[in-house]
Amino acid sequence: MGKKEMIMVKGIPKIMLLISITFLLLSLINCNVLVNSRGTRRSWPYTVLSYRGKEILKKQKEDILKRLMSTSSDGYRFLMYPSQQKFHAIVISMDKFPQDYILAGPIRNDSITHMWFDFYSTQLRKPAKYVYSEYNHTAHKITLRPPPCGTVPSMNCLSEMLNVSKRNDTGEKGCGNFTTFNPMFFNVPRWNTKLYIGSNKVNVDSQTIYFLGLTALLLRYAQRNCTRSFYLVNAMSRNLFRVPKYINGTKLKNTMRKLKRKQALVKEQPQKKNKKSQSTTTPYLSYTTSTAFNVTTNVTYSATAAVTRVATSTTGYRPDSNFMKSIMATQLRDLATWVYTTLRYRNEPFCKPDRNRTAVSEFMKNTHVLIRNETPYTIYGTLDMSSLYYNETMSVENETASDNNETTPTSPSTRFQRTFIDPLWDYLDSLLFLDKIRNFSLQLPAYGNLTPPEHRRAANLSTLNSLWWWSQ
């Protein structure tokens, strides 16, 4: 046997060893897959369905349609003409929990789950139409309550979600003392745009878009700790945004911290000093409260008048050190619900192109109700906004406990005043800012070259009184 043949013979056991190890690894992988396939695994929600999965979903919808058609003649009319017929309820049997839905409340396996269910099948070549439904887990039946609101996004579905939130009977519960970030930022670029909510165009400002978008992320993330809360407001957000189901908490917190730092006071540039004159200096500029000028509907501007402007480096937005502090998650939910109601007043017929632009708008009238009443009445009904207010302690001169019922016996020089939480305060102050811009734009064609008004955040209620509709 030659030397070359000896090398080949010695290499044969090594090749066989590698082949046997490969087969062993493949067998272990196959066994692991087999074990996992037997267990109950939760399917990944973002995977594309295979052909078999699509066929199974199609058969499920066909079965639902057959049961709906076989109930009565109302079922046929409800299916073919959903917007023209009104019924109290249609009950059909359903063995499994549906897939195409938007939750209106938590999933309760021992009772009823409220949702908006898409009852149209894909083979009908029609857009998705959501109808408010109640699924009974114990009886394995679903109750459809027509008429459907339509597609999502749409103004009809947003209005129906606001109507359901007014009743508050979907099983939602409070979230205790869980806090979150305040997304009502004041120091943001100001611009207006038109959003398409379905086929409806809505005029929205930039601060409202920032607030609603960040609120959708924060409340979706808050459901990790509050599993029975925020379903209705998250359903409303689907009419404006595409919020992912799973949110990276670390990225969200870092983003909110960066945005929060941009709202703080402007830092002063440190100056070089000699060793002899070293002293303690304040890292921030001193905040001086300045009353904003009064703006009315008949204000006049003079083109030759000297306008004093505050330097950008000295502009402060909040005199205290607790600016942009955390708020309760339930307060954020209530404020977001209120802002969603204002979208209806920015749409037709309340916002026609040929409207009287100098008259009081329906949007301002609706906001004025919130200022004067903690349970304001809207076109969707009465909403409870009491969580957006708190008792603020204010000093009282020459007043005793017997003179005023609001004065506490232990501190006769102080009393409580009902005021707004920070997000609502910033929201109202932004209306003051927009009102200045509105009056400036009305006077600009008549007077030509004018300097835009400077605005500082309102530091007290007397500054907010500059709103021309405040005292009405």
Curated annotation (Swiss-Prot):
Q: Which residues are glycosylated?
A: 109, 136, 163, 168, 177, 225, 248, 294, 298, 356, 391, 398, 405, 439, 460
Q: Is Glycoprotein found in the keyword set?
A: yes
Residue ranges that the Swiss-Prot or TrEMBL entry lists as coiled coil:
none
Q: Which GO terms describe its biological process?
A: host-mediated suppression of symbiont invasion
Major subcellular location class: virion
Record localization: Virion membrane
- Record keywords, A-Z: Glycoprotein, Membrane, Signal, Viral envelope protein, Virion
- Superkingdom classification of source: Viruses
N-terminal signal peptide = 1-31
GO CC, any one term: plasma membrane
How this chain assembles, per its entry, is: Forms the envelope trimer complex composed of gH, gL, and gO. The trimer interacts with host PDGFRA.
Q: What's the stated role of this polypeptide? A: Plays a role in viral entry into host cells. Forms a trimeric complex at the surface of the viral envelope together with gH and gL. This complex is required for entry in host fibroblasts. Mechanistically, engages host receptor(s) including PDGFRA to mediate infection.
Q: Family, per the entry? A: Belongs to the herpesviridae U47 family.
| Protein name, per record | Envelope glycoprotein O
Say which species the protein is native to: Human cytomegalovirus (strain Merlin)
